[in-house]
């Protein structure tokens, strides 16, 4: 009997026949095992999430970073409420073991210190009250004025305060609905416009208990304070998410407005995203398409259906455009019903220029406080006119009787917000009104400077008495039909006159009464170059330009060519510049590097077009080599500017580029009393130039009587006057 005969194969046969059940059982067991492992991992993860502050054991103590170095609480208070809130907030911050400082905005100089808060990892809290007529309190007035001007000043840019973390709480009264918490809204907006990072939605405290969200202003502050402390704790942990994460274009509001959340502004404003700060557009999608069409376009649309949607849209747009055109013609006639021309300053223009710091006068004039006026009031140096001609910058009023201009220069300071034209077609104000209000507005702006850190009392008193007037603010002053009467009024008030024209009105130059100093802008040496840079409105602009230079040569008073160098645009063809000099024979030639005006759709200039001071010096030296009657006289390095003087002002080896202003007033008075028969020349009222103002001096044009101020950031200052 063989071995196979005694071996029973029935068990194996049974397993083989039931193999499918065995496979299914193994698969089921494996599946259950995997499910158990997954569930265990999920339970472990959920337990870890319940301890958000648990330290990461993988990080060594040496690798931990400090995300918040401290908190600075700034307050602007009139009755002491904001100051009291600052003390309460400081106590709460101290509980987090963070250094805290309470600062009165009246004693804080943002020009010197605010940018320093960026690198210090400090969180800044601003508690500001709205006072009479929506204005800031006296203690916060200067800070708010500086912040507004900086936010609307192209030289600061949109990233000036990038990295600064801040939160704002406002104190107001909703009974004054139109001004409710206006100051805190503006501070929040201006900080955002300068690139600062908002860490918490703006809080609003309401003194009106009936309307207060939490029953009182104290309760409003307590709710905001709780949120602020919570945000600080998150920042300490390194969380970088700002606010509620729903900020768009400066509008800061939470998705859900629960207890303690800041309300949207009653008027629904977008803080820095206001209409005037957004890119211009014709209308919104809702306006163009209608509600139903707009809603349909928010979903997926078949290509074949686009025609059915777009045809009504185009028809609506044409009808709307036609209606708007008719309305515009009815709104804007060339003359008003009483026969007078339209006002040059429209509501939109008034709003734009007011934001830029202008004080507008009547219907076509304006005055603005120059940055160099502010600088000299604080003993920080004067402008290049102080170095070249001896004007007292803190007593200089910068104004214009005409905001309109005949050119659209690529380096225009105001991005062409002012109107343009080739003739006067607007309503005209009398020169007496212009001068009176210009002086009053200038004095009011000087008064607002009182209390600013570093202000010199004696210069403040002197600044209240205007001694010089620079008619060069913006626009074309010589377009004003009564410019001669205005100049005579200036001289009668003992104010010297510095008039700038863009060389497009030769006949007006010939008729011009004597001025202290007459400037002509020479922005290019060739026809094509002038067209490219100045973009004049006149078709015969080049002939007008040449005729203006010839008219300048006939003037007996001081005349100046003003050359603005734009690298890669007008720094070549020196011989052509020399020929233009021989055409007008100016007493002086100012050569200045262009000031970068920021990005603009109207200009293609970039920082690459701004020449360095060394490049301006080299250009001046090469130009003087072609002008046998001229030499380099003065330099003002800070303004990137040099002065070329005619040799007739160099007497016995000494330059006499400064002006004897009292002597000029005597001469112009004699001229007027004689009916114009008793004339005088530029050499009759010249004064000796001090050594520090000369080219090659160690001071580089900075008056040693003042103290030079260097900004904390090391970026080279190429800003102008």
Curated annotation (Swiss-Prot):
Residues 242-291, 305-339 are annotated as: Disordered. Residues 275-290 have a biased composition (Acidic residues). One of its GO terms (biological process) is tRNA processing. It is an enzyme of class 4 (lyase). Pfam families: Flavodoxin_1 (PF00258), Radical_SAM (PF04055), Wyosine_form (PF08608). It catalyses: N(1)-methylguanosine(37) in tRNA(Phe) + pyruvate + S-adenosyl-L-methionine = 4-demethylwyosine(37) in tRNA(Phe) + 5'-deoxyadenosine + L-methionine + CO2 + H2O. It comes from the Eukaryota. The keyword Metal-binding applies. Residues 389-635 form the Radical SAM core domain. FMN binds at residues 77-81, 168-200. Belongs to the TYW1 family. This is S-adenosyl-L-methionine-dependent tRNA 4-demethylwyosine synthase TYW1. The lineage of its organism: Eukaryota, Metazoa, Chordata, Craniata, Vertebrata.
């Amino acid at each position: 009997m063989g071995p196979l005969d005694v071996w029973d194969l029935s068990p194996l046969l049974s397993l083989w026949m039931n193999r499918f059940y065995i496979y299914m059982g193994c698969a089921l067991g494996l599946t259950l095992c995997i499910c158990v492992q997954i569930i265990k991992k999920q339970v472990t993860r959920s337990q870890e999430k319940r301890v958000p502050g648990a330290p990461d054991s993988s990080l060594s103590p040496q690798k931990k970073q400090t995300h918040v170095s401290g908190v600075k609480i700034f307050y602007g208070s009139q009755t002491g409420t904001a100051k009291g809130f600052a003390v309460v907030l400081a106590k709460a911050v101290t509980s987090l073991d963070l250094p805290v400082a309470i600062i009165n905005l009246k004693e804080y100089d943002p020009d010197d210190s605010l940018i320093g808060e960026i690198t210090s990892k400090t969180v800044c809290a601003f508690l500001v009250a709205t006072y009479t007529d929506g204005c800031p309190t006296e203690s916060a007035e200067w800070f708010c004025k500086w912040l507004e001007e900086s936010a609307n000043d192209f030289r600061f840019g949109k990233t000036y305060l990038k990295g600064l973390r801040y939160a704002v709480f406002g104190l107001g009264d909703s009974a004054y609905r139109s001004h409710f918490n206006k100051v805190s809204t503006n501070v929040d907006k201006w900080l955002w416009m300068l690139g600062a990072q908002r860490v918490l939605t703006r809080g609003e405290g309401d003194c009106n208990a009936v309307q207060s969200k939490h029953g009182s202003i104290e309760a409003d502050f307590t709710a905001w304070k709780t949120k602020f402390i919570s945000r600080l704790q998150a920042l300490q942990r390194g969380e970088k998410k700002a606010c509620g994460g729903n900020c768009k274009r400066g509008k800061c509001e939470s998705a859900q407005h629960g207890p303690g959340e800041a309300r949207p502004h009653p008027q629904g404003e977008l803080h820095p995203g206001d209409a005037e700060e957004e890119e211009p557009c014709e209308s919104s999608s809702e306006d163009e398409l209608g509600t139903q069409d707009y809603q349909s376009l928010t979903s997926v649309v078949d290509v074949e259906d686009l025609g059915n949607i777009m045809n009504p849209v185009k028809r609506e747009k044409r009808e709307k455009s036609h209606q708007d055109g008719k309305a515009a013609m009815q709104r804007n006639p060339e003359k008003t019903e009483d026969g007078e021309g339209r006002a040059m300053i429209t509501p939109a223009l008034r709003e734009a220029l007011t934001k830029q710091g202008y004080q507008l006068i009547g219907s076509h004039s304006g005055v603005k406080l120059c940055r160099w006026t502010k600088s000299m009031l604080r003993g920080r140096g004067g402008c290049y006119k102080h170095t070249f001609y001896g004007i007292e910058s803190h007593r200089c009023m910068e104004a214009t009787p005409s905001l309109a201009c005949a050119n659209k220069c690529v380096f225009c300071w105001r991005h062409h917000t002012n109107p343009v034209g080739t003739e006067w077609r607007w309503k005209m104000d009398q020169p007496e009104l212009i001068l009176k209000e210009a002086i009053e507005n200038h004095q009011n702006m000087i008064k607002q400077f009182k209390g600013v850190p570093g202000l010199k009392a004696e210069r403040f008193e002197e600044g209240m008495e205007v001694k010089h007037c620079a008619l060069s603010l913006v626009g074309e002053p010589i377009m004003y039909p009564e410019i001669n009467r205005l100049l005579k009024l200036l001289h009668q008030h003992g104010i010297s006159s510095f008039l700038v024209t863009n060389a497009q009105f030769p006949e007006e130059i010939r008729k011009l009464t004597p001025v202290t100093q007459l400037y002509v802008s020479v922005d290019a040496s060739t026809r094509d170059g002038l067209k490219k840079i100045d973009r004049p409105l006149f078709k015969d602009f080049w002939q007008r330009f040449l005729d203006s230079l010839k008219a300048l040569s006939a003037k007996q008073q001081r005349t100046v060519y003003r050359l603005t160098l734009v690298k890669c645009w007008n720094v070549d063809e020196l011989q052509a510049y020399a020929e233009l000099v021989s055409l007008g024979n100016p007493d002086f030639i100012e050569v200045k590097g262009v000031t970068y005006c920021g990005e603009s759709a109207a200009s293609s200039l970039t920082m690459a077009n701004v020449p360095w001071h060394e490049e301006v010096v080299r250009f001046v030296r090469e130009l003087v080599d072609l002008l046998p009657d001229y030499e380099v006289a003065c330099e003002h390095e800070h303004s990137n500017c040099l002065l070329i003087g005619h040799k007739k002002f160099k007497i016995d080896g000494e330059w006499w580029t400064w002006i004897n202003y009292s002597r000029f007033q005597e001469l112009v008075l004699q001229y007027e009393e004689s009916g114009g028969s008793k004339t005088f020349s530029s050499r009759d009222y010249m004064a000796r130039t001090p050594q520090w103002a000369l080219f090659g001096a160690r001071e580089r044009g900075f008056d040693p009587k003042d103290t030079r101020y260097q900004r904390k950031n090391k970026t080279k200052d190429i800003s102008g006057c």
